[in-house]
C-alpha cells in the first residue's frame, strides 16, 4: 500500500524533449540538512534569471531528504531557454512546509555564492510545492521573485488536512459494525506500524468496501465482485466525502498514515492534536450520530495553520496557477482561496477540465503553455487568462485532447468539503457565574458514549482555577446530533462551546473553553487550559 501511495502522491512528470546545451551542476547540503541541486547553462548571465523548483509531498516511509532532488518537470525547457535552475530536497519529508522557506533561503544563498546574483527569479511548485512556493514569496527571504507557476498547488495550505481527517471519521462511522474492518489504530493520531499496519489497512478496506479486489480486477467484473453491502457502504463513503472511487485508497492512506506522521513528528506538531469536528455537520443524520467527535485546543489549531496558511502578501509577484478539474487529492477548490486572497491583476488561474480524475494529470503542452504565458507576462506582455493559455497550448499541439483549459470553469466554494464553524449553535447552555465562580454545563457528551449530562463545576477552596464536579444528572440522547459540550477521555479534555459569563447581555461575547480533567485520590477536578472568543 505504501508504495502505491508514494507513487501516486509524488508529483507527476512531464515527458520533455532532449536538449544538448552544456550545463554546470552543483550539488551539496545546506546547514538545515537539506540537499540542493543546481544546474547552470554555459555562459549564463544574471539577466538570464533563475528558476527554483519546489517538489511535492513525500510519504511517511521516506524518512530522510532525497540527496539528489529533482529539478521538476520543466527543467530541460527552462535550461534550454537560458535559465539556471535550482531545487532543495527540503530538510523535512512529508508536510515539509514548517521549514521549507528557510531551506529555500539557504538554497538561494548557495546559488549566489556558487554562481552569482540573478536579476530575476521564477518559482515553480507542484502539489505541496504550491504552498511551499507561496510561503517562499510571502516570507520575502528570496529577492526578485517576479513570477510563479503553480501546478495543482495545495495553496489553501494546512487546512487541506481537514479533508483527510474527515474521511477517516466518516469511514470509521460507516464501517464500525463490519467484523474485522477496524483500521490499524484505534486513535486517528496513532502511527501504524510499517508492514502490519499496511496489511491491516488493506484488509479493512476489503472487508468494508471490497475495494481492493474490485480495483485489482477492474471494470464491470471488479464491481460485481463486491457484495451488495460492500457496495452500499462504498457508495455511502464516496457520496458523503464527495471523492471519486479512484482516490479512496490514496486519500484514506493519507488519513491513516500521513496525518499521524504530521502530528507526531518532533519538529512539526510534536504530539499536538489540531484536528476537530465537534461542530461539523456531515450532512447525514446517521453519520452525525455515529461519527467520533473531537475538539482541539486553539493553540494546536493555530500551530498547524501557521505551517502554512497563505496571507496573500505576495509583493509584485505575478502568479499563474493551473489545476486539473477532478483532482480529489488536492481539490480544485484550493484555487478559490487563492483567488480570494490575491489581487486579480497578479493572478491567472486556468483549470484543465478532464474526463478521468487525476492529481496533476496535465499534458506536456498544458504545462509548457502555462510556463511560457507566465514568462511573456513577466516580460511585459498582457496578463493571460485561461483562454489565452489554452490558445497558446493549441498553437503547439494540434491534438485538442492535449489542451483542456476551460475559461468558463466555475471554482468550488472551498477547498474544504466540511468547513469549520467554531461559533456553531449548541445544544444546551454553558455559563459561568462570576458571582459564585460556578460553571453550569448542559448536555455534556462523553465521546463515544450514549446519553449526556447536566452538571456544575464548583471552584476548589484552595485554587479558584480548579473546579470540582457536582450535581451530575444523566439525560437521554435526543435522537439527533447537535453541537454540544464534549468530554474526550483519551485526552482528558473538556470542551465547553459558547460559554456565557453571567450576567450576560445580548451583545456580550461567548467563549469556547477547554479544561483538563484529573482524578487524584478520588477527587475529580478540572483545570482551565485555554479559551477563545466565538463570533456568534
Language-model segments: residues:
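Short beta-strand/loop motif that positions the catalytic acidic residue
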Residues: 320-323
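Gly/Ser-rich "nucleophile elbow"/oxyanion-hole loop immediately N-terminal to the catalytic nucleophile
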Residues: 45-46, 107-127, 144
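Conserved alpha/beta-hydrolase "acid-adjacent" motif
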Residues: 329-333
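Primarily recognizes the serine-hydrolase "nucleophile elbow" in alpha/beta-hydrolase
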Residues: 120-176
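Accessory cap/linker subdomain of secreted extracellular hydrolases
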Residues: 154-309
Amino acid at each position: 500500500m505504501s508504495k502505491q501511495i508514494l507513487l501516486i502522491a509524488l508529483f507527476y512528470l512531464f515527458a520533455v524533449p532532449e536538449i544538448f546545451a552544456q550545463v554546470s551542476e552543483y550539488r551539496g547540503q545546506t546547514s538545515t540538512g537539506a540537499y540542493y541541486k543546481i544546474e547552470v547553462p554555459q555562459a549564463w548571465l544574471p539577466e538570464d534569471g533563475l528558476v527554483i523548483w519546489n517538489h511535492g509531498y513525500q510519504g511517511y516511509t521516506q524518512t530522510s531528504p532525497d540527496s539528489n532532488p529533482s529539478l521538476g518537470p520543466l527543467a530541460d525547457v527552462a535550461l534550454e531557454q537560458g535559465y539556471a535552475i535550482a531545487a532543495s530536497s527540503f530538510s523535512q519529508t512529508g508536510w515539509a512546509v514548517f521549514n521549507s522557506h528557510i531551506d529555500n533561503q539557504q538554497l538561494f544563498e548557495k546559488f549566489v555564492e556558487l554562481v552569482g546574483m540573478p536579476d530575476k527569479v521564477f518559482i515553480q511548485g507542484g502539489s505541496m510545492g504550491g504552498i511551499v512556493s507561496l510561503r517562499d514569496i510571502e516570507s520575502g527571504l528570496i529577492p526578485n521573485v517576479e513570477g510563479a507557476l503553480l501546478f495543482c498547488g495545495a495553496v489553501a495550505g494546512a487546512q487541506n488536512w481537514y479533508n483527510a481527517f474527515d474521511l477517516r471519521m466518516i469511514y470509521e462511522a460507516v464501517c464500525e459494525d463490519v467484523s474485522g474492518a477496524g483500521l490499524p489504530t484505534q486513535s486517528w493520531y496513532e502511527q501504524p506500524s510499517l508492514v502490519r499496519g499496511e496489511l491491516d489497512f488493506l484488509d479493512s478496506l476489503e472487508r468494508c468496501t471490497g475495494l481492493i479486489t474490485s480495483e485489482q480486477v477492474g471494470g464491470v467484473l471488479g464491481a460485481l465482485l463486491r457484495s451488495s453491502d460492500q457496495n452500499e457502504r462504498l457508495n455511502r463513503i464516496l457520496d458523503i466525502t464527495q471523492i471519486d472511487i479512484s482516490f479512496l485508497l490514496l486519500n484514506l492512506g493519507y488519513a491513516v498514515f500521513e496525518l499521524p506522521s504530521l502530528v507526531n513528528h518532533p519538529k512539526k506538531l510534536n504530539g499536538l492534536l489540531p484536528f476537530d469536528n465537534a461542530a461539523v455537520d456531515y450532512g447525514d443524520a446517521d453519520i452525525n450520530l455515529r461519527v467520533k467527535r473531537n475538539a482541539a485546543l486553539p493553540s494546536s489549531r493555530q500551530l498547524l495553520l501557521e505551517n502554512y496558511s497563505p496571507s496573500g502578501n505576495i509583493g509584485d509577484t505575478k502568479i499563474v496557477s493551473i489545476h486539473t478539474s477532478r483532482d480529489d487529492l488536492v481539490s480544485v477548490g484550493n484555487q478559490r482561496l487563492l483567488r480570494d486572497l490575491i489581487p486579480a491583476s497578479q493572478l491567472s488561474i486556468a483549470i484543465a477540465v478532464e474526463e478521468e480524475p487525476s492529481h496533476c494529470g496535465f499534458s506536456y503542452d498544458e504545462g509548457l503553455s502555462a510556463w511560457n504565458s507566465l514568462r511573456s507576462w513577466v516580460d511585459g506582455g498582457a496578463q493571460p487568462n485561461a483562454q489565452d493559455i489554452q490558445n497558446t497550448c493549441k498553437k503547439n499541439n494540434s491534438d485538442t485532447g492535449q489542451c483542456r483549459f476551460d475559461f468558463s470553469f466555475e471554482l468550488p466554494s472551498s477547498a474544504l468539503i466540511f468547513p469549520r464553524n467554531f461559533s456553531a449553535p449548541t445544544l444546551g447552555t454553558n455559563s459561568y457565574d462570576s458571582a459564585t465562580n460556578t460553571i453550569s454545563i448542559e448536555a455534556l457528551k462523553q465521546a463515544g458514549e450514549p446519553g449526556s449530562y447536566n452538571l456544575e463545576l464548583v471552584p476548589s477552596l484552595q485554587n479558584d482555577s480548579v473546579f470540582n464536579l457536582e450535581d451530575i444528572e444523566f439525560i437521554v440522547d435526543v435522537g439527533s446530533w447537535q453541537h454540544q459540550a464534549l468530554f474526550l477521555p483519551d485526552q482528558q479534555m473538556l470542551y465547553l462551546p459558547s460559554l456565557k459569563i453571567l450576567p450576560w447581555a445580548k451583545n456580550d461575547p461567548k467563549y469556547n473553553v477547554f479544561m483538563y480533567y484529573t482524578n487524584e485520590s478520588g477527587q475529580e477536578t478540572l483545570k482551565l487550559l485555554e479559551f477563545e472568543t466565538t463570533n456568534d
